[in-house]
Amino acid sequence: MDAKFHKLIRLADTISMREMEKHAIEDLGIHGLVLMENAARSVADWLTENKLKNNPGARVVICCGKGNNGGDGFATARLLANRGYDIQVVDAGEVKKGDSRKNQLLWEKFGESTTFPDVNASLMIKEADVLIDAIFGIGIEQSIEGAYREWIEIFNSNKTALRVAVDIPSGVSTDESKILGVAAPVSYTHLTLPTKA
């Protein structure tokens, strides 16, 4: 291949991604909600343009964890619901804080969440046409066990849905590209920066 086609891409690890986010918030004065909204809009725009505009009746289920990745998921749900799509949210059911909590409360003004574990949540995940993984983002480094493991296994049981991860598939280490007990394999990963994983 001709050298002019080669492009050096710098890969971001967990520490550098957190430093960039901190710089944007603290040094540049960009509110965390704005960063979350931009991430969510990017996911919603991509899904609308590439997957949903030709299938407007698709059942979309967004699985939201307790951290910032879950906040991205709630914001994505709200944006897609505003566009008229059938959106269902499965929530980790744990208390959220900060911007994630604000996006959870905003979503609750537009739609309903089903808390996991719940029979309805499992059924929603298994019957979805599009599954969005917003459970864990870049922050997880320990093995996934307990209810979260069960949740990801149910997510994985739907073999026919289009599966999209926000930032990185849950259960994959950002820095080491290894699976942390269990992972959510996806068709597409939507991220703002290339990562080592």
Regions found by a protein language model. Give the residues of each.
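Single conserved hydrophobic/aromatic residue that forms the stacking wall/gate
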Residues: T195-A197
